[in-house]
């Protein structure tokens, strides 16, 4: 059979068209597989990045000296977090400048989750005091750790049995009664000054650079007539009968000393309590913060951890890490105003 030229040409065109279609299908398949592979790879890498943290040792910076309440809570937390995270958590103390040195070190550390920090209430005062440039805004909070009520204490043989007794004596002899406190601008002193202003009295405030321990020693030695102290520092003296507690300068009663009235309840509004939290520097990835928050929540809610806190003189304090930043910033603004009002300074 002999084909016409037009029929032969049509056959060639048909073959050519099939080859083009086949090539196009091949290209589509190649790009489709590549896209799927890329998507799968991207998903896997994201999951892998999340699941891999933490992979190495974590450093926990405590901005206050070894041996104190902040150091104690930092070491308790580090040991518990090791069990939750499966890596070593090592505490490094960086005291100085009213916690300013350590807070600056935490805020300026690499925001990769391998440096976390204990954040004391001083983060709300160090800037106004001139000790550092950090504020609560420079951190993302893992969890709150505890709170410490600020107390006005006197020796067991003191003539004063209540805050009203102290106020009456101060009104009779303005500025003659001495009270020791743990350094200029500390949370206890700020609460004390607010209470004195509300009561309309004046005490001779003696600041001790050695902290609350030095103030207690001075009171027990008769060098000052009363002192401010946190529950963690005072509880053993109270239990042994060496101290009387006239009032709690915090806004709420202490779970450890529920029968001690707050100054606010007595009509003299103030909030001189201290607290502690754990945080990472601002800019830390959200997935890393999430891992730390979940672990921190487990630690803080564990019964054995709560029991240890109570034994050490700390009250429980649970505020969501994400929400706590707002609370801390409010405290920062309030304390900054008090520091300016009373012209307090580290210098």
Regions found by a protein language model. Give the residues of each.
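Hinge/capping helix and adjacent helix->loop/strand transition within the periplasmic-binding protein
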Residues: 108-114, 128-214, 275-308
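An extracytoplasmic/periplasmic, membrane-proximal ligand-sensing/linker region
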Residues: 55-57, 197-198, 203, 287-347
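Extracytoplasmic/secreted proteins, especially bacterial periplasmic and envelope-associated proteins
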Residues: 72, 76, 80, 84, ...
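N-terminal (or domain-start) structured segment
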Residues: 47-138, 176, 201-225, 316-318, ...
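Short, low-complexity disordered leader/linker segments with a strong preference
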Residues: 1-59, 345-347
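C-terminal lobe and pocket-closing loops
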Residues: 233-301, 333
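Residue-level signal for nonpolar/aromatic packing positions in well-ordered secondary structure
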Residues: 29, 58, 67, 74, ...
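Ligand-binding pocket segment of bilobal, Venus flytrap-like solute-binding proteins
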Residues: 176, 180-184, 188-260
């Amino acid at each position: 059979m002999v084909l016409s030229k037009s029929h032969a040409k049509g056959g060639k065109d048909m073959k050519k068209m099939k080859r083009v279609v086949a090539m196009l299908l091949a290209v589509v398949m190649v790009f489709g597989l590549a896209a799927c592979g890329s998507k799968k790879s991207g998903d896997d890498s994201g999951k892998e990045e999340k699941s891999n943290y933490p992979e190495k040792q974590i450093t926990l910076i405590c901005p206050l000296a070894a041996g104190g309440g902040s150091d104690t809570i930092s070491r308790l937390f580090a040991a518990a977090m090791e069990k939750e995270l499966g890596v070593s958590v090592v505490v490094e103390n960086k005291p100085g400048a009213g916690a300013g040195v350590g807070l600056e070190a935490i805020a300026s550390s690499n925001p990769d989750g391998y440096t976390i920090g204990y954040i004391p209430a001083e983060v709300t005062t160090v800037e106004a005091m001139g000790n550092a440039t950090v504020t609560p805004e420079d951190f993302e909070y893992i969890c709150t750790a505890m709170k410490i009520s600020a107390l006005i204490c006197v020796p067991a043989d003191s003539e004063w049995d209540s805050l009203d007794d102290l106020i009456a004596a101060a009104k009779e002899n303005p500025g003659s009664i001495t009270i020791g406190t743990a350094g200029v601008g500390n949370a206890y002193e700020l609460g004390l000054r607010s209470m004195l202003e509300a009561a309309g009295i004046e005490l001779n405030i003696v600041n001790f650079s050695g902290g609350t321990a030095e103030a207690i020693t001075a009171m027990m030695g008769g060098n000052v007539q009363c002192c401010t102290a946190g529950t963690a520092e005072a509880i053993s003296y109270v239990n042994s009968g060496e101290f009387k507690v006239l009032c709690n300068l915090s806004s709420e009663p202490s779970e450890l000393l529920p029968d001690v009235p707050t100054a606010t309840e007595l009509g003299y509004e103030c909030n001189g309590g201290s607290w502690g939290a754990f945080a990472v520097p601002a800019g830390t990835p959200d997935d890393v913060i999430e891992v730390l928050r979940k672990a921190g929540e487990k630690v803080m809610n564990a019964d054995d951890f709560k029991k240890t806190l109570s034994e050490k003189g700390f009250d429980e304090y649970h505020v969501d890490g994400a929400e706590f930043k707002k609370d801390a910033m409010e405290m920062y603004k309030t304390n900054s105003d008090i520091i300016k009002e009373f012209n307090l300074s580290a210098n």
